[in-house]
């Protein structure tokens, strides 16, 4: 069966929620029994977001196969069952890199390389490749219509729509319909101008998703339909909602999934949203609440920890609790002391890079260990917990990571120079390797030790979790730390790399080298986060 395409663009302003809208529509189509995937096309020139500042771009989401991608792919995986891969996200930088590589290799036989056709052909080829095998592929274009950067992507999609046939393509455009309090009405003119901008490059939208803080009246929807040349039933009002997980039902109530299926002549059962109804019920009917302190380096932009934030909320759903997240800059722990950690039910230290704020994370781990506060450390949060234990329990006063201090007496964390990837191939790195694309990335197997909290939570011996790091526990110094009581409860498949540590005689102190947040979903949660939030609730009873 041929793949059908839905191209999602945005207009008027950025940050309207194209990714959430695309994921919600995908969830609806999946609930009708269709096989759906989503792709994100990013117009920036970086090859991938792997080396971009978290405070500028937000979180880097890691896929099962090790791609460092846009955080929207996290939304996609939280809404649908399809796992994202390297094929689901590419940038202008990646496209140009590939075209230039082919030119140097002589693939173009001496032709003059141009945006059209060479860049647009490469974009089309990647979209077709990523969409192969699915009933519907939803392709989101980053940025706003009118941006210079996104023009090659839009031109490529215009051409693709012509080539595969308009009966197999839908252009879905998100716009802002602002409410003007002084006039007491919503204004449709920005939407009309945004559609005019699309028309100027040869694209007629088939569906308009109109973002507003309220439902758009029927008469205004009729006006938008008339002046934008779109059927009235394809003008969808998408108001602000309390939970993003309400959006699939909101789109369904206006018949968007039915419109798509009719357009593509797809037969399917009515969308079964019972799982989403259960999510919303648990969200609306909590039996208690907990406050989790997230001690990080990039807390000025919560999106830098988007998947962690969502995983905590999912754990709240699992435990029927409302989770309040208190963001604490790890540098504040250094300058103001551990008083900033008081009145927390649990403490989570997420990943990060660089020495800034690390001593604050180490102090945080010490505070949680000594005061019996439930602690979950992720990536750097595990490494700082191990450094703290080495310094204050194992007597290794100068313990540190070679990432931060090159010549410390006890480099308990060191650069991984060799590891085995998921296929069993050995990868090697040195301190001179490029920063981009050189980490231990993607899903790796982990062996859990019998009798550990981790084994109890997961309920099985072997798990698979996603990684993004280039430093690991130094095995030569590990015996000294274990002799002081620290338990290693998770190891890599070849038993060479430490994956999970636990502090014994503590209510709940678990830290992992991998990133469990990337596989947490609202429907299924994640065992580590669920166990952590449950322990935080039990901590209130003390």
Swiss-Prot record:
Q: Signal sequence: where?
A: none
An example Gene Ontology CC term for this record: cytosol
Q: Which residues bind Mg(2+)?
A: 72, 140
Q: For L-glutamine, which residues are the binding ones? A: 352, 380-383, 403, 470
Q: What class of enzyme is it?
A: ligase
Q: Which residues bind CTP?
A: 14, 147-149, 187-192, 223
The question of whether Acyltransferase is a record keyword is answered with no
What Gene3D superfamilies has UniProt attached to this entry? 3.40.50.880, P-loop containing nucleotide triphosphate hydrolases
Q: Which catalytic residues are annotated?
A: 379, 515, 517
Looking up SUPFAM superfamilies in the UniProt record yields: Class I glutamine amidotransferase-like, P-loop containing nucleoside triphosphate hydrolases
Regarding activators and inhibitors, the annotation says: Allosterically activated by GTP, when glutamine is the substrate; GTP has no effect on the reaction when ammonia is the substrate. The allosteric effector GTP functions by stabilizing the protein conformation that binds the tetrahedral intermediate(s) formed during glutamine hydrolysis. Inhibited by the product CTP, via allosteric rather than competitive inhibition.
NCBIfam families noted in UniProt: PRK05380.1, PyrG
In the record, the note on similarity to other proteins reads: Belongs to the CTP synthase family.
| Other observations noted | CTPSs have evolved a hybrid strategy for distinguishing between UTP and CTP. The overlapping regions of the product feedback inhibitory and substrate sites recognize a common feature in both compounds, the triphosphate moiety. To differentiate isosteric substrate and product pyrimidine rings, an additional pocket far from the expected kinase/ligase catalytic site, specifically recognizes the cytosine and ribose portions of the product inhibitor.
Protein name as catalogued:
CTP synthase
Q: What organism, scientifically named, is this protein from? A: Actinobacillus succinogenes (strain ATCC 55618 / DSM 22257 / CCUG 43843 / 130Z)
* Lineage of source species: Bacteria, Pseudomonadati, Pseudomonadota, Gammaproteobacteria, Pasteurellales
